[in-house]
């Protein structure tokens, strides 16, 4: 996604691809595109939006703002749809990095999916929630001894090896624990997905995985086979995020299965018979804006499964089990962030033009993606109806940073005012999980809504939480 052009130019004078088309009527500003907003979200005749039967005005009054609101049915339905598309929950590993708390871990468990974690903290939350360790896979490019030890002691299903150092480290830890740990090797296949540079992870110049092109991946595989306490059960690859087509996956599968063929040729069918998994990672895209059009999950799954079957048959191998790791595709669409408008300011940027800034009570501390990735979002007035004409505005946060932007350019009702509630769609992935305490602003609460009821999932941080980290007397 491209950043909005910088510089003091009036927003309405910009003819940039990222500036949305001007709505033709006030009613158009009120529309909530079903491909972007949660499944159980509707706007009433009074303009107030409800999610799963709960008005957002009630949520804001009870829990405060900013507030993350999760449509539980939306999250669970996406779990079921993806599991059905890929042949069962055991082949779908929810990527905890998108968003994890104990409640989410329980939902994922109840829907029969497996779970990917990337740190000791994510592992601890999953185990605290009672998630079965045997269905957990541990990722990460720099797993510490403590993290690997905790994983082995918990009995996790798989560890994805990311370096040769880690092979020796994990072999020693598993040996000391008296277990044989199932592992996959993460292979860098040289595919750069058509996405933002910072989240494209399978090209060569990056910190993840072991290169196929240089032979590092095969060398790592040889080292795993030489250990006493590791069992290689498959190969892993991840080519990026927010991907809308299968072209990159097809190339990745071709190269990973080609490597699997070489491994079988070198070590023999008997010794490699347990290598039954090809994990193509995550990266399945979602709609952030009304015109976004990712493929239906069943269509994407059918294509990926056929690619793996075809590539395996081409090299004379039995079809391995295809594993995928969706995070955003499950967590992203069913959550919105509620903000309260604090100030509205028209700033002159030339003798004849101005820019409207709508400031809300959160910002880059609860959603860094706009600043970090130039991400785009759909934002709407959700607390009332308005027949005012559209005005192009920039929704910004309250932090001491000029780049603190929630939505760079969006059309709002011209009468938007302090006290109004703004909803930002599709914030369930990589918003709370990447949140911070910048300016010592406390993290928002998270609530789940279902069947007309709302319940607190994560409470709002307080000043007492901030002060609890202080060491008295120093």
UniProtKB/Swiss-Prot annotation:
It catalyses: meso-2,6-diaminopimelate + H(+) = L-lysine + CO2. GO terms for biological process: lysine biosynthetic process via diaminopimelate. It comes from the Bacteria. Pyridoxal 5'-phosphate binds at residues 283, 325-328, 430. The keyword Ubl conjugation does not apply. InterPro entries: Ala_racemase/Decarboxylase_C, DAP_deCOOHase_LysA, De-COase2_C, De-COase2_CS, De-COase2_N, De-COase2_pyr-phos_BS, Orn/DAP/Arg_de-COase, PLP-binding_barrel. The active site is at 400 (proton donor). Pfam families: Orn_Arg_deC_N, Orn_DAP_Arg_deC. Specifically catalyzes the decarboxylation of meso-diaminopimelate (meso-DAP) to L-lysine. HAMAP family: LysA. This is Diaminopimelate decarboxylase. It comes from Mycolicibacterium smegmatis (strain ATCC 700084 / mc(2)155).
């Amino acid at each position: 996604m491209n950043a909005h052009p910088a510089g003091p130019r009036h927003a309405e004078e910009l003819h940039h691809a990222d500036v949305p088309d001007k709505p033709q009527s006030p009613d158009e500003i009120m529309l909530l595109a079903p491909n972007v907003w949660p499944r159980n979200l509707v706007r009433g005749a009074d303009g107030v939006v409800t999610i799963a039967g709960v008005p957002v005005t009630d949520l804001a009054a009870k829990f405060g703002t900013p507030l993350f609101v999760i449509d539980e049915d939306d999250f669970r339905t996406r779990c079921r749809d993806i599991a059905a598309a890929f042949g069962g929950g055991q082949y779908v590993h929810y990527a905890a990095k998108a968003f994890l708390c104990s409640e989410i871990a329980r939902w994922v468990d109840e829907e029969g999916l497996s779970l990917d974690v990337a740190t000791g903290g994510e592992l601890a939350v999953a185990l605290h929630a009672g998630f079965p360790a045997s269905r957990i896979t541990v990722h990460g490019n720099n797993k510490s001894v403590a993290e690997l030890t905790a994983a082995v002691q918990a009995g996790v299903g798989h560890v994805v090896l990311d370096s040769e150092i880690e092979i020796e480290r994990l072999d020693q830890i598993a040996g000391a624990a008296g277990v044989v740990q199932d592992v996959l090797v993460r292979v860098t296949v040289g595919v750069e997905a058509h996405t933002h540079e910072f989240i494209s992870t399978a090209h060569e110049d990056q910190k993840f995985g072991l290169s196929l092109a240089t032979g590092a991946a095969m060398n790592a595989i040889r080292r795993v086979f030489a250990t006493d306490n590791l069992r290689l059960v498959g190969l892993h690859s991840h080519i990026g995020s927010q991907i809308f087509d299968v072209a990159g996956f097809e190339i990745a599968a071709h190269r990973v299965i080609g490597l699997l063929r070489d491994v079988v040729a070198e070590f023999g069918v008997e010794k490699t018979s347990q290598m039954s998994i090809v994990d193509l990672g995550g990266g399945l895209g979602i709609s952030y804006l009304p015109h976004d059009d990712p493929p239906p999950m069943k269509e994407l799954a059918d294509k990926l499964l056929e690619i793996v079957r075809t590539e395996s048959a081409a090299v004379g191998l039995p079809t391995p089990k295809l594993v995928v790791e969706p995070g955003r595709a499950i967590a992203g669409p069913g959550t919105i962030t509620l903000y309260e408008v604090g100030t509205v300011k028209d700033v002159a940027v030339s003798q004849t033009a101005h820019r409207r800034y709508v400031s809300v009570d959160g910002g880059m501390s609860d959603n860094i993606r706009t600043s970090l990735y130039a991400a785009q979002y759909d934002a709407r007035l959700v607390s009332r109806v308005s027949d005012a004409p559209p005005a192009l505005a920039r929704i910004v946060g309250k932090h001491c940073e000029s780049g603190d932007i929630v939505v760079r350019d969006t059309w709002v009702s011209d009468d938007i005012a302090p006290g109004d509630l703004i909803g930002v769609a599709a914030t369930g992935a990589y918003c709370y999980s990447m949140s911070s305490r910048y300016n010592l602003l406390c993290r928002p609460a998270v609530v789940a809504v279902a069947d007309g009821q709302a319940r607190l999932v994560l409470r709002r941080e307080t000043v007492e939480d901030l002060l609890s980290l202080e060491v008295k007397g120093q």
